[in-house]
């Protein structure tokens, strides 16, 4: 330990505009709230806190659009869409972007079959019509590869899914589905990403010893809740949460090398909290995915800009505003320039 010398601590003198703070925030960075678009399959279910379609699960705006005709059974099968099915899927994507979606996620893990199709169509449509980008992640499985960097040598990531058999089937069929989509598009999609051999961006092999696929088939109440309709559905989510947490803990005891959990099943995402408490391990899920994508549009740009101020003058307190939930849009005259002339020049391509 080095020598510690006590020095008087002086708080910086910062002046805040408490009268018209939001007007000043607008001048700095804009406060249009980030919007997440949820692409839905043609399937109705009761949403609950923690579900990707429940607005209480996020602190930003959520909109949704349904790919009509793409039922759960069809999504699970991953069969090729006919011309009508493809148009209905693309129409749902257009609705999301036209209504302000900054990025798009799916409400069903099986939508991973259309990751490439939706991603490339969304990017193309958003760019041509609005001159912007629209990131797409249809499944939390896209987090599997980067999460491997977080676990120790010999460790595993437990991938939690509703049905182990169904998820194993996805691995076998996904490359075929993607290849068919590429052929339909004249091979354009394979050239739109750096790794043409894996254009989905989901580089995962469930036979990799670093992954442990765990199905919730044995959790009876959860399976019943998935299968049930209307009044027959299981409503006591606390009981289901306890069952899932206990099941994961038992799996963990048999597989102590599991260092983290990744929830693939969208409807199981609402129980991530129970797994965290029950197992003591970090858990990532579809909600994590939405929050991760939202951070590409929010928080630090307004906060840092407001804290620094223009040329260091009179910074605002970001915690006293909602700027952290907004994105720097450049839609209002002069707002980019308020961050400094160089930022306006960057946007105009003159710097």
Swiss-Prot record:
It is an enzyme of class 4 (lyase). It catalyses: S,S-dimethyl-beta-propiothetin = acrylate + dimethyl sulfide + H(+). The gene is ALMA1. Disulfide bonds: none annotated. The keyword Amino-acid biosynthesis does not apply. This is Dimethylsulfoniopropionate lyase 1. Coiled coil: none annotated. Keywords: Lyase. Mediates cleavage of dimethylsulfoniopropionate (DMSP) into dimethyl sulfide (DMS) and acrylate. DMS is the principal form by which sulfur is transported from oceans to the atmosphere and is a key component of the ocean sulfur cycle. The active site is at 108 (proton donor/acceptor), 265 (proton donor/acceptor).
